Amino acid sequence: ASVNLVVAVLIWAMVYPMMVAVDFASLRHIHRRPKGLVITVIVNWLVKPFTMAALGVLFFEFLFADLIDPADAGQYIAGLILLGAAPCTAMVFVWSQLTRGDANYTLVQVSLNDVIMVFAFAPIVALLLGVTDLEVPWETLLLSVVLYVVIPLAAGTATRALLTGKAGDGGRGAARVARFTAGVKPFSILGLLATVVLLFGFQGHVLLNDPLLIALIAVPLLIQSYGIFFLAYAAAWAWRVPHNVAAPCALIGTSNFFELAVAVAIGLFGLNSGAALVTVVGVLVEVPVMLSLVAFANRTRNRFPTAAENETAASGDTAAALVPEEGRR
C-alpha cells in the first residue's frame, strides 16, 4: 500500500473539522422522520456508485473509445468509481444552509452516511473495480478508509465528547463545539486550497493542454450529478418529504466526498494518474453544478410541503386512527 504523507496531512486538515460536527447521538432519533434517511441511504449506497461505474464504462469504453488512449480508459473509470462511491460529508452543511435545510436533520443524514461509509466504501469500490476488470488492491483500499475516514472520525468524535462534556449542561457543550469548529475551519480551507494547488501542479499541463479530454471526463460527471439529484428530489417530492429535508437529502448524493476520492486515487494510482485527474475534474465540475441545483431547489420550494404541514397531516392521521369507526360515521 502506498500513502503520500503530504496528501495525508492535507486530507486530515480538511476532514477533521467536519468530523467534529458529526453527532452520533443524533442517530437515536432516526425513527422519528425516516423518509429522508431512507431516500439518502438507497440513493447514496444502492444507486449512485453503480450508475457512476456504468456511465464510466459506457463513455470511456464505448462512446469515447475513439477519442482517448485505450490504456488510460481504465484509470478514468476508476476515478469515476472513487468519486461515486462516497457521498459528500463537508460541503453538505453549506448546501443545506443555502437551501434553508433542517440543520439537525442534515447532521443526522451525514452521521448515518459516515457510519455506512466506514464499512461499505472499500467493498463497493473493490466490487466495481473488479467488475470493470481493474486490479483490486484491498490493502490500499482498507488503509485509505482507516487513514481518511476512521482516524479523522474517531478524532472528531473524541474532540466532540471532550467539548460537550456531561449531558444536561444547558446547551453549553453545543456552543463549545460550534466555537471550536469555527476556529479550526480555516485549517480545513487551507488544506483544501493546498490540495488543489498540489493536484493542479501535477495535472495542470493536462488541464491546460488537453481541454477536449477534460470535457470528455466532465460529461459522465455532469450526467451523474444531475441525474442523482433529480432522482432523489423526485422521490422526496412523491413521498411528500418537507423541502427543508428534501433539498439536503438530494444534494448529499449529488455531491461527492472528493477528499477521500483524491486520497485513494493518489494512493492507488499516483499523483500523475488518470484517476487522480478525474478527481481534479470532479472538483472543478462540482461547485458550479451544486450552485445551479441549489438555485433550482430554492425556486421549487413551494412544490413541497413545509415541515409544519407534514406535522399537521401526521397529527390528523393519528387523530383519525384513534376515533372509532362508529364515531366517524
Name each region found by the language model:
Residues 1-254, 258-329:
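Alpha-helical transmembrane segments of multi-pass small-molecule/ion transporters
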